[in-house]
């Protein structure tokens, strides 16, 4: 939003300094600062509210006996609200919303955020210990992976920016002259990567309730 506003002001009135908004580095830095401000101000309020509502992680006794889940008990859950807010608001404010990659990243983030929210909601509000059934979580991850992979593969013109054309070709690490074309298998590869990375964070969060390190990476 701010990107389009700055672009309009720059083209209409041509004030000095507004040309800086066209640089991704500037907008990335501005988005990072915005996210930091949101998390600093909103985070403590949400955490305090969750603690007041006694919304916390429940540790499994059998895992605590094995030395696992020792740090999980009482950790406020639904902290993903802070992460999602700090990601989505700066992205919408500073990113180029005409770029399909940006749109799809926001869609994927919001989609998986809804899956996570449903899981926590069922655990905390509905008092269902297992939350959202595992197969439904996987189904949600595979579903958004198929949407993302298929849209990129079947509509490559939407994802081609300037001289950078979309390609299913990839290079093999440490062998720059060795290329591999995924072809139609690009779609299941997108599904695999999205599901794997999503579950990597989910499993880490399930161990101690502290997934922010993995999310940051």
PLM feature spans:
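"…together with the soluble PPM/PP2C metallo-phosphatase catalytic core" -> "…together
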Residues: 2-217
């Amino acid at each position: 939003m701010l990107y389009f506003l700055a672009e309009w002001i720059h083209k209409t009135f041509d004030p000095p300094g507004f040309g800086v908004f066209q640089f991704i580095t500037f907008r990335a830095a501005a988005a990072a600062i915005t996210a930091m401000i949101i998390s600093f101000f909103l985070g403590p309020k949400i955490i305090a509210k969750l603690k007041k509502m006694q919304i916390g992680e429940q540790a499994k006794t059998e895992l605590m006996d094995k030395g696992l889940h020792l740090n999980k008990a009482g950790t406020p859950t639904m902290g993903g609200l802070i992460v999602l807010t700090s990601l989505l608001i700066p992205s919408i404010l500073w990113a180029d919303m005409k770029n399909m990659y940006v749109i799809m990243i926001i869609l994927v983030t919001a989609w998986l955020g809804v899956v996570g929210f449903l899981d926590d909601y069922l655990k905390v509000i509905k008092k269902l210990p297992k939350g959202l059934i595992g197969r439904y979580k996987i189904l949600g991850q595979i579903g958004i992976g198929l949407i993302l992979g298929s849209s990129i593969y079947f509509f490559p013109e939407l994802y081609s920016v300037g001289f950078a054309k979309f390609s299913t070709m990839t290079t093999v690490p440490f062998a720059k002259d060795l290329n591999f074309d995924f072809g139609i298998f690009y779609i299941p590869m997108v599904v695999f990567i999205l599901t794997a990375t999503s579950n990597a964070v989910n499993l880490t969060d399930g161990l101690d309730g502290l997934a922010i390190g993995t999310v940051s990476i």
